[in-house]
Amino acid sequence: RKNGTPVTIRDPNDATALGIGMIHQHFKLIDVFSVLDNIILGAEDTKLGFLQKKKARQKVSELSDRYGLRVDLDAKVEDITVGMQQRVEILKMLYRDNEILIFDEPTAVLTPQEIDELMQIMKNLTAEGKSILFISHKLNEIMAVSDRVTVLRKGKYVGTVETKDTDKQALSNMMVGRPVQLQVSKEPAQPGKVVLDVK
């Protein structure tokens, strides 16, 4: 359902027509194309059969500024960082005017600094009225950016809770179906006799 209306999504074109876009864990970019070409590919604006690249560049630049997604539009994708490639994926979805963005394990390939930047980008997007579905098993990130959490276990719905009304312990229990010990206390290791001495 979208806005209470049942919908059928057979392919990415159906999703885009409904304003739904997905940022995959493994990016769907063409390395030898420029950033701009990757963003507009498949959604090219044409007039009398001619590509309106200047108009597309202006729209992408405006989106980039609006959401804090700075990236060199002329750089080749193969020459930019993984974090920048993710920004390109996000801009692709925004260029298509998607209102619902699905992030599939988006932090799996990012550095800690890039993760912090992504969290801020997601907050900027929601502040502008975008809806985000954030698929993750990283509880710290879920608690930092979500308003509501839905837990699935083995592909089945377990429950939905408001983030403000839960904690990592409760979410862990929902995820595995039993109480989970998040903090493990154990005695410091006691070394045994030397078995190899290298000089």
Where does each model-flagged region fall?
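Glycine-rich phosphate-binding loops of nucleotide-dependent enzymes
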Residues: R1-K199
